A protein has these predicted regions:
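Short, flexible, surface-exposed loop segments at domain boundaries
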Residues: 2-5, 16-43, 47, 61-124
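Hydrophobic core
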Residues: 8-14
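Short, structured beta-strand/loop micro-motifs enriched in basic residues and often containing a Trp
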Residues: 51-59
Length: 124
């Protein structure tokens, strides 16, 4: 009986959710994404196309299909591919969205310094 109690306690401890910090790429930009009719979307109010293999990660870091996000305003971090198509999208949690500053343009990301360990940007 005592073994069962220890096993149950161990299982409960291991089952606790882990709130690990997500790692964003150093070329990720911040913006507001509204998916229209996939692959069409608005990014910061401007029309863009989603790449054919776009990876959209929701707030739990699970892959989500673009069709399930139609007409939702989402605060995101995103990357672009070589053709200017949106390649990776991370839908931000409230805590991640408050992490500031974060570059909104390629020019800002080139001028600012990124610390990959702390996942923080600093302005010059």
């Amino acid at each position: 009986m005592l073994r069962c109690v220890f096993a149950l306690c161990a299982a409960l401890v291991l089952a606790l959710p882990v709130h690990a910090q997500r790692i964003f790429e150093n070329n990720a930009l911040r913006g507001e994404l509204v998916v229209k009719a996939p692959p069409e979307a608005l990014l910061n109010g401007k029309p863009v196309r989603l790449a054919p293999g776009v990876r959209i990660r929701n707030q739990q870091n699970l892959i989500q299909l673009s069709g399930t996000l139609v007409d939702q305003r989402l605060v995101v971090n995103y990357t672009l591919d070589g053709m200017g198509l949106v390649r990776d999208v991370w839908v931000l949690t409230d805590e991640e969205a408050r992490r500031w500053p974060w570059p909104r343009t390629i020019e800002e990301s080139r001028a600012w310094q990124f610390d990959p360990t702390l996942q923080r940007w600093t302005k010059p």
